[in-house]
């Protein structure tokens, strides 16, 4: 079929398998260009490995460190009538390129919150790798089905205490609007912590540890975002922030546990990037369009891949073997360049000046839209979008 982008709200409902493959190819090339990562882990599990930072982690481990990788994700395969999800095609492409280089790559597709996912992963590790040296936890799901009760809990992207009103961009109409978001109820806050907090990360590490599949010195990392006062009301000071604080709580408990065998657990605070998740958060697209332009001008812009490469090579697995620098909460900070005072001051000054008319001149909004479409495999250089493509792509993946 010939596949064109179709946008509905924050989601592109179509995906392009060849475009997704080309994206992955580019990320691999970027990783290889940096040269091998010294002291890199050789057996890596990535929970949430099909897009964004999770995919970048798997690519970095495999193509930067030569690691055997297991990826866990929840994606849909394509059929002859309908394309699959971008994450399916990303994972298929990763698997193809890893195997071409003789790297071990296996994937599990299903609900990572489930007990079955953890058990199947443990069985696979025991069977193929024995133990693992690193666990990356990169789940970004709006819902969690509780494994014991089957109850489905939903998270909320809402402020706490009062209605939040701010200048935002309507990405469908390319227009500056005033967006208002009602505050979360106590139950919504609690539910957001249940879905997006640190409990499932703990369940994963505890299950892997009890099964004896974590090697001595195993490191685990989970991803977070703090941002700045421009986004705090909806993010860090909102329901989502409460969940991210719970991630810090979990990191402390897990670090204590893993330290007995020479391991570590850290939250890595990353920079804002264009992802399906961030596009759904009011004000984030406008903020990202502003901050990207300034960071590009300053020569410090990074995408997902550059961020994770820096985390591996300059934080967790440094060439001299020294311990990673952390903040007062034991977090790895990769948002340091974004939070530079000159960059943030630029955004603060610019925010009130942006209108629908000057949006494309004052910010990198055009690039934001291009990057958003690229998430789904569209607008990628070197891809013929008028060509007939097969949406059915198979690879080495087992259902959970």
Curated annotation (Swiss-Prot):
The record marks 75 as: Plays an important role in discriminating NADH against NADPH. It comes from the Bacteria. Substrate binds at residue 225. It holds the Pfam family Enoyl_reductase. GO terms for molecular function: enoyl-[acyl-carrier-protein] reductase (NADH) activity; NAD binding; trans-2-enoyl-CoA reductase (NADH) activity. It catalyses: a 2,3-saturated acyl-[ACP] + NAD(+) = a (2E)-enoyl-[ACP] + NADH + H(+). NAD(+) binds at residues 48-53, 74-75, 111-112, 139-140, 244, 273-275. InterPro entries: Eno_Rdtase_FAD-bd_dom, Enoyl-CoA_Rdtase_cat_dom, FabV-like_NADH_b, Trans-2-enoyl-CoA_reductase. It is an enzyme of class 1 (oxidoreductase). GO terms for biological process: fatty acid biosynthetic process. Its EC number is 1.3.1.9. HAMAP family: FabV_reductase (MF_01838). Involved in the final reduction of the elongation cycle of fatty acid synthesis (FAS II). Catalyzes the reduction of a carbon-carbon double bond in an enoyl moiety that is covalently linked to an acyl carrier protein (ACP). Belongs to the TER reductase family. Monomer. This is Enoyl-[acyl-carrier-protein] reductase [NADH].
